[in-house]
Swiss-Prot record:
Keywords: RNA-binding. GO terms for molecular function: RNA binding. Disulfide bonds: none annotated. Belongs to the eukaryotic ribosomal protein eL8 family. Signal peptide: none annotated. It comes from the Bacteria. InterPro entries: Ribosomal_eL30-like_sf (IPR029064), Ribosomal_eL8/eL30/eS12/Gad45 (IPR004038), RNA_bf_YbxF-like (IPR023460). The keyword Nucleus does not apply. The gene is ybxF. This is RNA-binding protein BH0128. The keyword RNA-binding applies. It comes from Halalkalibacterium halodurans (strain ATCC BAA-125 / DSM 18197 / FERM 7344 / JCM 9153 / C-125).
Amino acid sequence: MSYEKVSQATDLVIGTKQTLKALEQEEVLEVVIAKDAEPRVVNKVEAMASVKQIPIIYVDSMKKLGKACGIDVGAATVALKK
């Protein structure tokens, strides 16, 4: 998945807390994680996505991921909902 796919998605969950909630409720199709995010921030998302067998896609930049989501700040994680 690329930034372009995120920017074209119609149903996104932005941020680590919201991504974790969506994963718990099994509403997630794919998870996008920025490589420059702090490991302590994204570890739970990675673990839960792995357990639930949700594909994880890595992108280079939190700032670019946030911009692709239409926000002016960086985003560590984004989930595409089913």
